[in-house]
């Protein structure tokens, strides 16, 4: 398969003759085992990481290199209950490697404020925190994954064409095929476009507009429900309960 991929799909642009040190992939060991990347795909990921490292020499790229795969260190694959897909990382030093999350000292971004408003309106006893750190969700089995893992300062979507698409799609399809009874929360077109990767017979897929202020107020024409009022957080826990899985405490937001 590696030889076919190299010759047919990637036209021999990458060499798989040289082994890859798994530590250079920045992924947590459990994720390396779970994804079972072939030698060719490891080399392809390493090439992408090297490209990002070179870009950092001449421009500011978010998140920092040590946070690029932070999602894999916060949430073990066997613990996943819910997958929340973001787009590309925050700017202005806010990106932490977890979709929608920011460090406690950072101001809560507009999209996350919309998420907190939906939680406060739908989840009993939820109280909006003073910070935007979602690490505690990740520790409960909520995978907070951006579809594009890096972005150039001041240029939203600037790294969409670099090659992250194949890698994050591989992650999603691996979760779908290897795990059971997970909930996928897909908000906005870029996340919803990944729906074909998910086996809806094994998992619950919930879609809505993106929780950005404009979209969440219905300011954009869309075929998908508005984010405000989608009730996804309760629906996710209802599904987990039906399948005898531990629910997510959405209100547990420790700094």
Swiss-Prot record:
It holds the Pfam family UDG. Belongs to the uracil-DNA glycosylase (UDG) superfamily. UNG family. This is Uracil-DNA glycosylase. SMART domains: UDG (SM00986), UreE_C (SM00987). It is found in: Host nucleus. InterPro entries: UDG_fam1, Ura-DNA_Glyclase_AS, Uracil-DNA_glycosylase-like, Uracil-DNA_glycosylase-like_sf. Signal peptide: none annotated. SUPFAM superfamilies: Uracil-DNA glycosylase-like. NCBIfam families: PRK05254.1-1, PRK05254.1-2, PRK05254.1-5, ung. It is an enzyme of class 3 (hydrolase). The active site is at 88 (proton acceptor). Its main location: host cell. It comes from the Viruses.
